Design a protein with these regions (language model features):
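Dinucleotide-binding Rossmann-like beta1-alpha1 core, especially the glycine-rich loop
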Residues: 84-166
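N-terminal Rossmann-like FAD-binding beta1-loop-alpha1 element of flavoenzymes
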Residues: 38-63
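Extreme N-terminal leader/targeting segments of oxidoreductases
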Residues: 1-38
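C-terminal catalytic lobe of FAD-dependent flavoproteins
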Residues: 313-317, 322-435
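Glycine-rich FAD pyrophosphate-binding loop
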Residues: 56-76
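Helical element adjacent to the flavin cofactor pocket in flavoenzyme catalytic cores
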Residues: 144, 151-152, 178-238
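Helix-loop-beta segment of a Rossmann-like dinucleotide-binding subdomain
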Residues: 27-28, 125-135, 167-201, 205, ...
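Active-site substrate-recognition segment that forms the wall
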Residues: 113, 121-129, 215, 223-225, ...
Length: 439
């Protein structure tokens, strides 16, 4: 008897979104301007949004991207777009006071709505849908925490509720969870098309975008301006905005000591039949679970299962993480057994010690960083707001009021301590998985 074919037998080791992106303009070998009002370092979502807004304000803007537009996390994510942070509204108000805490949360809501409006305004074909999402409880105790989260969201007017396991059948084709938090203000998009659309919008507004140009160092001049030294020569700028997130290197040493690059991996299957896709996700929701080593998944616009997670805190190959994710996907959705995995890839997520995004000024530059796994809405919005702040004289975002903590360990950009942290999280997830269901 022949063995079943390996689902990973012919996987492409690149992001699905990049593979499906139409050809883009060649932005390499363009001459750099000598002097600008705003130099943006990083050509992802935050950088392109800042460049667009700066140019709209009439500034001379140059964007410097070491690889290609959207090459990093901006085109490697699951494409899930939603308000909120690790901490809900009630926790934010407890930590930062009622006024600031609520303002911070509402910025995340504004970011989601700004995303939808920008896509509409610029005519970006990013397959944006308002689908809502489910956070699935791996244990009964987690469902209790999710009920608290639903109550917290209700205090700021968000439509959220919890459902128990029997009700899950109307939302998802799995019996692996104890229940879920359902949040309606949420959605999905194609992140590669979104960042490409923001880049095109920035160019239409007058920004100059350059690929294959690595920023090496930023130094201050006596006249208050900065010199950005690059692999293609220097640029003098009145303001510098750094938007490198999980790919931050020596160009911004102060940020590098505050942002930890953590790997996240994704697989995507061949397109599913309409019947199988509907059985798995009848309402087209975005999904993620309540573990520390969480899984997140969704159906893509062409009905592929996209399944991701932090498969390991140890250095791992794409093939190894793809195998781990395949096993996880089949535990959640055994009906996908035998479906071929077509794409597998990894990327770096920028995490901060307080698990919050940050925007502000540090070491002579302005920055927006720390997506913490939920950056599609908030980071480009912060890029937009940062340009308004430093060029247009608008108030700083509420998030700029937060102290940006250093990583409390000897750390210069290589998170050597993550494997030990990961094992602690894995043990907590194992214990949660052993809880008995409640009657």
């Amino acid at each position: 008897m022949s063995r079943p074919a390996d689902p990973l037998r012919s996987v492409e080791r690149r992001p699905l979104w990049q593979a499906q992106l139409p050809p883009q303009p060649d932005r390499r070998a363009r001459p750099l301007p000598d002097v600008v009002d705003l130099a943006v370092i990083g050509g992802g979502l935050a950088g392109c949004a800042a460049a667009r807004r700066g140019a709209q304000l009439g500034a001379r803007v140059v964007l410097l991207e070491a690889e290609s537009i959207g090459w990093g996390a901006s085109s490697r994510s699951g494409g899930m777009c939603h308000p909120g942070f690790k901490w809900g509204p009630a926790e934010l108000m407890e930590r930062h006071g009622a006024i600031l805490g609520e303002s911070i949360y509402r910025e995340s809501v504004d970011a989601f709505e700004w995303t939808a409006e920008t896509i509409r305004e610029e005519g970006i074909e990013a397959a944006f849908v308002r689908s809502g999402h489910l956070q699935l409880a791996v244990a009964p105790s987690h469902l209790e925490h999710l009920a608290t989260a639903a109550a917290s969201l209700a205090t700021v007017g968000e439509a959220a509720r919890t459902i128990r396991a029997p009700e899950l059948r109307d939302e998802i084709g799995t019996e692996a969870y104890a229940g879920a938090l359902v949040v309606e203000r949420s959605g999905g998009l194609d992140p590669a098309r979104y960042v490409a659309g923001l880049a095109a919008a920035a160019e239409r507004a007058g920004a100059s975008l350059h690929e294959g140009v690595r920023a090496l160092r930023v130094r201050s001049q006596a006249d208050g301006r900065a010199v950005v030294e690059t692999s293609a020569g220097p640029v003098v700028a009145r303001e510098v905005f750094v938007a490198t997130n999980g790919y931050t290197d020596g160009v911004a040493p102060a940020l590098r000591r505050r942002v930890m690059p953590i790997g996240s991996s994704i697989i995507a299957t061949d397109p599913l039949s309409e019947d199988l896709a509907h059985a798995i996700s009848p309402n087209g929701r975005m999904f993620f679970d309540s573990k520390n080593f969480l899984y997140y998944w969704r159906l893509t616009p062409d009905r592929r299962m996209l399944f991701g997670g932090r498969a390991s805190f140890w250095p791992s190959s794409v093939d190894r993480t793809a195998r781990i994710l395949l096993e996880g996907m089949l535990r959640v959705h055994p009906q996908l057994a035998g479906v071929r995995v077509a794409y597998a890839w990894t990327g770096k997520v920028g995490f901060t010690f307080d698990r919050m995004p940050h925007v502000g000024r540090l070491g002579g530059v302005t920055y927006a960083t720390g997506c913490c796994g939920s950056g599609i809405a908030i980071l480009p919005y912060l890029g937009h707001r940062a340009a308004d702040w430093i060029l247009g004289g608008e108030p700083a975002p509420a998030l700029a009021s937060l102290r940006f903590p250093l990583v409390p360990a000897p750390y210069e950009g290589r998170p050597w301590f993550l494997p030990a942290v990961g094992e602690w999280y894995r043990l907590a997830d194992w214990r949660a998985g052993r809880e008995r269901p409640q009657d």
